[in-house]
Amino acid sequence: MSWLNSVLLALTSVQPYMVPATVIGLVSFAFLCFIFFYFFRAVKIINGLKKYTQSINGIENNEPGNQLQHLQSLFVQPELKHAWNEFEESLHSQYELEDGEEKIVRIRATAPSASFFSEQQLVDIPLNTEFFKHLPGILTGVGIIGTFYGLMIGLNHFDPSTPEQVSSSVNNLLRDVLYAFLGSAFAITFSILITWLEKFCLAKCYKYLEKFTAALDALYDSGVGEEYLASLVKSSNESATQARHLKESLVTDLRDMLLHLANSQKVENERLATTLSTTYRETGQQFAEQVSGAIENSLKSPLDKIAGAVQTASGDQSGMVQNMLQDVLTAFMAKLDTTFGQQFTNLNEMMGQTVGAIQTMQTGFGALLQDMRQVSDDSRQGSAQLIEQLLSEMKSGQQAMQAGMNDMLTSLQTSVAKIGAEGEGAGERMARQLEKMFADSEAREKAQAEHMTAFIEAIQNSVQQGQSATMEKMAASVESLGEQLGSLFGQIDKGQQQISANQQANQQSLHEQTQRVMSEVDDQIKQLVETVASQHQGTTETLRLLAEQTNRQIQDMHTGADKMRLAAERFEHAGDRVSEANHLTADVLNKAQSAGSSLSLATSELTSVVADYRNNREAVSKSIAMLELLAANTQSEQTTRTQFIADLKQHGERLQSYNREAQAFMENVSDVLGKGFEDFSEGVSRSLDKTLGKLDVEMAKASTLLAGSVEQIGESVSELDDVLSRVRA
C-alpha cells in the first residue's frame, strides 16, 4: 500500500488553482479542434451545397444534352464525381428523329438521387460526426474529473487535529472546492455550446443536401418503368385485338371464298353436263350420218354394176340366179329362225316363267301374311275364350263349393234331427265320426305345431347367434376402446414432453431469430441499392425480349395466312374431284335404293307379323301359368290362412319379448359406455389442466423474453426509421 500512498501524495501535492487551469486548457483545445475540424468544414459543405443547388436550378430550362454536360463539368470533386457517375448510369435517355438524326428529347430518372448522394457520404464522413457527437460528453467527463480531483486536494489539506486547524482547513477546503467547480462549470458550458453548434451545423447540412437532391430530381421525371410497362401492356392488348380481328376476317373471307367456290363449281358442273350432253348428241348424229353416207357411197357403185350385169345376163341365167338366190334366202331365213328365233322364244318362255314364279311367290307371301294374321287373331280369340272359360269354371267351382257347404249344413241339420230321432245308435255313430274328425284335426294341428316349432327354433337360433355376435363385437369394441385410451394417454404424455422440448427449442430459436433479423435488416439495407440497378437492367431486357416476341408473332401470322391460301387452293382441286365422284355414285345409289326399298318393305312386314305372333304366344303362355298358379294358391290358401294367422300372432308376441330383452341389454351397454366415457373425459380434463398450466407458465416466460426481444427490435426499428427519415429529409 506504500506505492498507493505515494501516488496519492504526488497527485494531491498540486496547487488547487492548477486544477481549473488544466480543465480550461483541455476544454479550450477541444473547442479549437471542433471549430477547425468540424465547424469550418460544415460551413464549407453548406456553401458548396448552396452553390450546386443554385447552379442546378439555373439549368432547369436548358436542353437535356446541355444539362448533362453542365452537370459533368459541375461535379468534379472526388466525393461528388463517383456519386454523379452512378446516378448518370441510372438515367434513361429518350431519343426522337429530327432531320434524320437521333436527338435526346428528354431524360428520365429510374432511381432517386438521394440513393446516390447520401447523407453518410457527403456529410457524415467529411465531418466525422460519429466522433464529434460524443465530444460534449467527453468534455463533461473532464469537468467531473476535475471536480473530484479538486475535492481530493481539499480533503488532503484538511487537518482535524485542533479546532483552530479545523476552521482553517474548512476555509482551504471550500476554496479548493470552488476552484474545482469553476473548472467543471467551464467544461459543461463549452460542452453545451459544442452540442448546440454540432446539431445546428448537422441540421443545416442535411437541409441543404435535401434541397440539392430535390433540385437534381426536379430536372428528371421519374416513372419511366411504369410508363414503359403501361405502353407495353397497351401494345400487347392492341396486338391481341388485331390478331383476333385478323383471325375473324380471315375466317369470314375463307368461308365466303369457299362458298363462292362451291357455288361456282356447282354452276360449272351443271354447265359442263349440259355441254357434254349436247356435244354427245351432235357427235352421235354426225357420226351416224357419216357412216350412212360412207356405206351408201361405197355400196352404190358395186350394186349398180351387179344390176347391170344381171340385166345383161340371159334369161336362163337370171332364172338360175333367181332360184339360187331364193334358195340362199330361204336357207338364210331358216338359219336365222333356228338361231335367233328359238333363243327369243326361249327367253320369252323364261321371262313368262319368272313372272309366274314371282306372282306365285307374291301370292304365297300374301297367303302367309293372311294365315299369320288369322293365326294371331285366332290365338287372341282362343286366349280370351280360355280366360273366360277359366273364369267361368272358377265361378262355377266357387258356386259348387258354396252349394256343397250349404248341402253339408243341411245334411248336418238333418243328421242332428235324425240323431235326436234315432237315439243312442245314431249318437254312437256320430261320436265315432266326430272322434275321427277330431283325430284328423289333431294330426293336422300336430304337424302344423311341429312346423311352427321348427320355424320358431330357427328364429331363436338366429336371434341367439345375433346376440352372441353382438356381444362378441361389443367386447371387441370395449377392448379396442381400452387400447385406444391407453394409446391416447401415452400420446398425451409424449405430447407433454414434446411441448416442453418444443418450448425450449422455440425460446432458443426465438433468440437466434432476433439476432438473425437484426443482421438481415442491415444486409437488406445494403442490398436495396443493388436491387434498384438490377431492376433497371431487367426492365430493359424485358422490353427487348417483348419486342422480339411481337415481331416473331407477326411473322408467324404471315406464314399462317400463306398456309391458309394454299389450303384453299387444295380444297378447290379436291372439290372438283369430289363433284365428279358424286355424279358417278348418284346413279349407283338410285338403282340400289330402288332395289332395296321393295325388299325392306317385305322384310319389315314379315318381321312385324313374326314379332306380333311371338308376343301373343308369350302372353298366352304367361296367362295360362298365372291362372294355374292362381288356382293352386286359392286351394292352398283357404286351408292354411287361419292357422298361419294364429302362428304369426304367437311369433309376434315372442318377437316382442325378444325386443324387450335386447332393449334392456342395450340400455345396460349404454350405461357402461357412458360411465367409461365420463371417466375418460375426467382423466383427459385433469391431464389437460396440468398440461395447460405448465404451458401457461412456459408461455408467460416466453412472452416476457419475446417482449424484451420485441422492445430491442422496436428500438432498432426506431433507429432505422430515424435514419430513413433523415435520408428522406
UniProtKB/Swiss-Prot annotation:
InterPro entries with a match to the protein in the record: ARM-type_fold (IPR016024), ZorA-like_t1 (IPR049670)
SUPFAM superfamilies assigned: ARM repeat
Subcellular location: Cell inner membrane
Record's keyword annotation contains Repeat: no
Keyword vocabulary terms for this entry: Antiviral defense, Cell inner membrane, Cell membrane, Membrane, Transmembrane, Transmembrane helix
One GO cellular component term: plasma membrane
TM regions (residue ranges): 20-40, 135-155, 177-197
Principal place of residence: membrane
Membrane topology category: Multi-pass membrane protein
Segments forming a coiled coil: none
Disruption phenotype annotation: When this gene is missing the Zorya system does not confer resistance to SECphi27 in E.coli.
One of the GO biological process terms: defense response to virus
Role description: Component of antiviral defense system Zorya type I, composed of ZorA, ZorB, ZorC and ZorD. Expression of Zorya type I in E.coli (strain MG1655) confers 10,000-fold resistance to phage SECphi27, 100-fold resistance to lambda, and 10-fold resistance to T7. While most T7 infected Zorya-containing cells undergo abortive infection, a minority produce viable phage progeny. These eventually accumulate to a high multiplicity of infection, leading to culture collapse by 2 hours after initial infection. ZorA and ZorB probably assemble in the cell inner membrane and exert their effect there.
Family under the similarity heading: Belongs to the MotA family.
Name of protein: Zorya protein ZorA
